[in-house]
Amino acid sequence: MNILHLDSSILGDHSASRQLSRDVVEAYKSTHADSHVTYRDLASEALGHFSAASLAAAGTPVEARDAAQQQEVDNNEATLQQFLDADVLVIGAPMYNFSIPSQLKAWIDRIAVAGRTFRYSEAGPEGLCGGKKVIIVSTSGGLHQGLPTGAGHEELLKALFAFIGITDLQFVRAHGLAYGEEPRANAMAAAKQQIESELLAA
């Protein structure tokens, strides 16, 4: 069982999503003794944003690439392969300005690859990544779930993973974290209880 654990919060030890994503991984490991965890901190070891240079590197024949292009291709392939090798993904995904962190979006741009994680056919797009499980730790200062202001956060992630064929998607939520000490404590406690009841009991 290969677990890919991704954090994207810029808040370090003060991050709620980091704390809860660790809890999710530990809970999953406790019920899956054969688990192997690969950890990636997308904030401290950020991928560059996908660019024209990224496309040019991928489209340049191997023998014609310069060193920078080859490094770009190698980094992108390593990121994609890390995703493909994972059976379970645990993703810390805080809301920043009504969406996900740009660091997480940069990772998504490396794993949404035509011919590798999805393809187009006469019937339309087809996801190629079925069989994986994704657990998303969703945190936010406000309360946006089900509102237009939340469309670029959880709904974006749902659409992306569905597009590449992943239907086993679970959210652990701690929202309203900026509403004061008591609401924050209550939201964190509820998320921890969800982890215990849904993951430790699995």
From Swiss-Prot:
GO terms for molecular function: electron transfer activity; FMN binding; oxidoreductase activity, acting on NAD(P)H as acceptor; oxidoreductase activity, acting on NAD(P)H, quinone or similar compound as acceptor. It catalyses: 2 a quinone + NADH + H(+) = 2 a 1,4-benzosemiquinone + NAD(+); N,N-dimethyl-1,4-phenylenediamine + anthranilate + 2 NAD(+) = 2-(4-dimethylaminophenyl)diazenylbenzoate + 2 NADH + 2 H(+). FMN binds at S9, S15, A16, S17, M95, Y96, N97, F98, T139, S140, G141, G142. InterPro entries: Flavodoxin_fold, Flavoprotein-like_sf, FMN-dep_NADH:Q_OxRdtase_AzoR1, NADH:quinone_OxRdtase_FMN_depd. Its cofactor is FMN. Belongs to the azoreductase type 1 family. This is FMN-dependent NADH:quinone oxidoreductase 1.
